[in-house]
């Protein structure tokens, strides 16, 4: 503990609680109240209704939910596959080479998502790899944005697996493929599932790049929320935000529970 005195720890706890309430709880509470409000002309809503949630689960909003889940799972699974492959491949190199190659994987996380979206839009709007107006361009953008986090988490998991375990399997005659399937991947599985949860949450909430490249029929929840609030439909946008937060949290909790069970 950096704070040794009981009074100091109590004060730090109070400050942390106040900051949590002000910057996390209150905004969500306001969004929830807005999603349930009939009219909000004063300090508090003057009436409550569930119509905004009904709107959030029908029509274009429901299509946006399905699109977000489809894009999120597809991009996250592909990023996980590539992240595991890259992390395993980098183990064959020296420390200095690993450092420089890791920087290449971390680079997308340092670039604003709007810049990533613009770059992908320009790169894949013409030529043999034209993807503009298709689902593939959205999947590409989401993959680029979450791949760095996937690689980082999987690399951390690999670093915590003792090399002695694989060496013992090798000394017993296990082939590299057998070691990978029956030793390395099972030990890495909790990290992989945990990373899948993180990637899915990042993809579900992505807006900056998606709003520049999404094709008709593949409007995601963040884009739908932005469109609703931009048109002044705050209540429906708030209801859709609550749906997005709830589904993302439920998926993360389920995947984290699976990860703990595997661990």
UniProtKB/Swiss-Prot annotation:
Residue intervals passing through the bilayer: 13-33, 69-89, 104-124, 131-151, 185-205, 233-253
Record localization: Cell inner membrane
Biological processes annotated in GO: transmembrane transport
UniProt entry keywords in alphabetical sequence = Cell inner membrane, Cell membrane, Membrane, Transmembrane, Transmembrane helix, Transport
Q: Which InterPro entries match?
A: AminoethylPonate_ABC_PhnV, MetI-like, MetI-like_sf
- GO CC, one annotated term: plasma membrane
- At the top level of its lineage, which domain of life is listed? Bacteria
- Membrane topology designation: Multi-pass membrane protein
- The UniProt record lists the ABC transmembrane type-1 domain at 65-253
Q: Which PROSITE patterns match?
A: ABC_TM1 (PS50928)
CDD domains, per the entry: TM_PBP2
Q: Which Pfam families match?
A: BPD_transp_1
Family (UniProt): Belongs to the binding-protein-dependent transport system permease family.
Q: What does this protein do?
A: Probably part of the PhnSTUV complex (TC 3.A.1.11.5) involved in 2-aminoethylphosphonate import. Probably responsible for the translocation of the substrate across the membrane.
Q: What is this protein called?
A: Putative 2-aminoethylphosphonate transport system permease protein PhnV
Q: Which organism is it from?
A: Salmonella typhi
Name the gene behind this protein. Answer: phnV
């Amino acid at each position: 503990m950096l704070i040794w005195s009981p009074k100091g720890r109590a004060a730090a706890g109070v400050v942390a609680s106040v900051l949590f309430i002000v910057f996390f709880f209150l905004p969500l509470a306001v969004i929830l109240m807005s999603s349930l409000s009939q009219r909000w002309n004063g300090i508090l809503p003057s009436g409550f209704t569930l119509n905004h949630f009904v709107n959030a689960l029908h029509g274009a909003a429901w299509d946006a939910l399905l699109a977000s889940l489809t894009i999120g799972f597809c991009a996250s699974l592909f990023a996980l596959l590539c992240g595991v492959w890259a992390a395993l491949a980098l183990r064959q190199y020296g420390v200095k080479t690993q450092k420089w190659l890791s920087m290449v994987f971390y680079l997308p996380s340092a670039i604003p998502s709007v810049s990533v979206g613009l770059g992908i839009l320009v790169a894949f709007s013409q030529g043999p790899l034209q993807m503009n107006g298709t689902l593939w361009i959205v999947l590409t953008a989401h993959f680029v944005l979450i791949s760095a986090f996937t690689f980082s988490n999987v690399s951390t998991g690999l670093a915590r697996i003792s090399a002695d375990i694989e060496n013992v399997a090798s000394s017993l005659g296990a082939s590299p493929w057998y070691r990978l399937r029956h030793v390395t991947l099972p030990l890495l599985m909790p990290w992989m599932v945990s990373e899948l949860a993180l990637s899915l949450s990042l993809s579900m909430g992505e807006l900056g790049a998606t709003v520049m490249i999404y094709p008709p029929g593949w409007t995601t929840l963040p884009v739908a929320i932005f469109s609703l609030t931009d048109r002044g439909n705050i209540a429906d946008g708030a209801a859709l935000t609550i749906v997005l937060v709830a589904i993302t949290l439920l998926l993360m909790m389920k995947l984290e529970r699976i990860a703990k069970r595997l661990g």
